[in-house]
UniProtKB/Swiss-Prot annotation:
UniProt xrefs under NCBIfam families: PRK05303.1 (NF003676)
Alphabetical UniProt keywords: Bacterial flagellum, Periplasm, Signal
Gene Ontology molecular function terms on file: structural molecule activity
Cellular component GO terms, alphabetical: bacterial-type flagellum basal body, distal rod, P ring; outer membrane-bounded periplasmic space
Job description of the protein: Assembles around the rod to form the L-ring and probably protects the motor/basal body from shearing forces during rotation.
Name of this chain's protein: Flagellar P-ring protein
Signal peptide bounds: 1-19
Disulphide bonds in the chain: none
UniProt similarity note: Belongs to the FlgI family.
Subcellular location: Periplasm; Bacterial flagellum basal body
Subunit structure, interactors included: The basal body constitutes a major portion of the flagellar organelle and consists of four rings (L,P,S, and M) mounted on a central rod.
């Protein structure tokens, strides 16, 4: 009897948990990307560059670049340029990058250029937080947007003032690394979880011997590794491919107050409750009335007077019952039955949590 009951419990736990690799749950502390930034010029634009009279830094940058190339611009010259734009260039320096390796860069206009399509980024040094140059960027910009204008009307799809250069920067300086120098490596969990940290520790200790791993906190697992780069690479390769049984995650509902989107995971459940939601709408109409004098030579003036009309309407919401829901599909059907908009749904979920009917953490971003 006891064995049968234990078998049922183990089968139930197996259905609730699923296995994931340690590499999908953690990252190695210190193995990360670093941000690079630079300021440069984009040339070759088809009349869509900066208006140099309004962006003097573009002209100043161009003069400095020409002087470095041995070209002197007479003092006081007013250059009316339309095919040059000042831009900021950003990139991510990957871990273990070597000299001569290429990385992608993102180019963004910082002036009043209309479009960077068809432009070429001139050689731009990319610096780190220590003001040292780590890469040089140059190349043709690929812009994903499109636009056209004529007769005062314009149409634009996506962003025209930003683009990307694939393999547009060459690494010139390598970052020092401490990998392979010590006898311990810290694995950082993607999300803080005491249970997951202990499960990863137990999995490593079962495979590598007791004491090989220690959970320092809810996010960090310290692993004892052999010395030397090649030995640590092999050791980490074996550890990262180990599988850990992942227990059900915390029930959570994430609400984006700016876009009105609501996202929930499959652990969210509802208790029975009743919801009444009223709709309040405010309409503001503003018109400009032009009053002109009746006599053209009477000395009167034309006056523009605004006329504003505000209309307030409120429709009563009926009391609707929400049944208890034990899975995500039932929760979705129950919320859809209310007929609420995403903006109304945000306030409904907050009220449900306050009333104790929403069994989940509510996070507003």
């Amino acid at each position: 009897m006891f064995k049968a009951l234990a078998g049922i419990v183990l089968a139930l736990v197996a259905t609730l948990a699923h296995a994931e690799r340690i590499r999908d749950l953690t990252s190695v502390q210190g193995v990360r990307e670093n941000s690079l930034i630079g300021y440069g010029l984009v040339v070759g634009l088809d009349g869509t560059g900066d208006q140099t009279t309004q962006t003097p830094f573009t002209t100043q940058t161009l003069n400095n670049m020409l002087s470095q190339l041995g070209i002197t611009v007479p003092t006081g010259t007013n250059m009316q340029l339309k095919n040059v734009a000042a831009v900021m260039v950003t990139a991510s320096y990957p871990p273990f990058a070597r000299q001569g390796q290429t990385i992608d860069v993102v180019v963004s206009s910082m002036g009043n250029a209309k479009s960077l399509r068809g432009g070429t980024l001139l050689m731009t040094p990319l610096k780190g937080v220590d003001s040292q140059v780590y890469a040089l960027a140059q190349g043709n910009i690929l812009v994903g947007g499109a636009g056209a204008s004529a007769g005062g009307s314009s149409v634009q799809v996506n962003q025209l003032n930003g683009g990307r250069i694939t393999n547009g920067a060459i690494i010139e300086r390598e970052l020092p690394t401490q990998f392979g120098a010590g006898n311990t490596i810290n694995l950082q969990l993607n999300d803080e979880d005491f249970t997951m940290a202990q499960q990863i520790t137990d999995a490593i200790n079962r495979a590598r011997g007791y004491g090989s791993a220690t959970a320092l906190d809810a996010r960090t697992v310290q692993v004892r590794v052999p010395s030397g780069n090649s030995s640590q690479v092999r050791f980490l390769a074996d550890i990262q491919n180990m599988e850990v049984n992942v227990t059900p995650q915390d029930a959570k509902v994430v609400i984006n107050s700016r876009t009105g989107s609501v996202v929930m995971n499959r652990e969210v459940t509802l208790d029975s409750c009743a919801v009444a939601q009223g709709n309040l709408s405010v309409t503001v109409n503003r018109q400009l009335n032009v009053n002109q004098p009746n006599t053209p030579f009477g000395g009167g003036q034309t006056v523009v007077t605004p006329q504003t009309q505000i209309d307030l309407r409120q429709s009563g919401g009926s009391l609707q019952s929400v049944r208890s829901s034990a899975n995500l599909n039932s929760v979705v059907r129950a919320l859809n039955a209310l007929g609420a908009t995403p903006m109304d749904l945000m306030s409904i979920l907050q009220s449900m949590q306050s009333a104790g009917c929403l069994r989940a953490k509510l996070e507003i971003i």
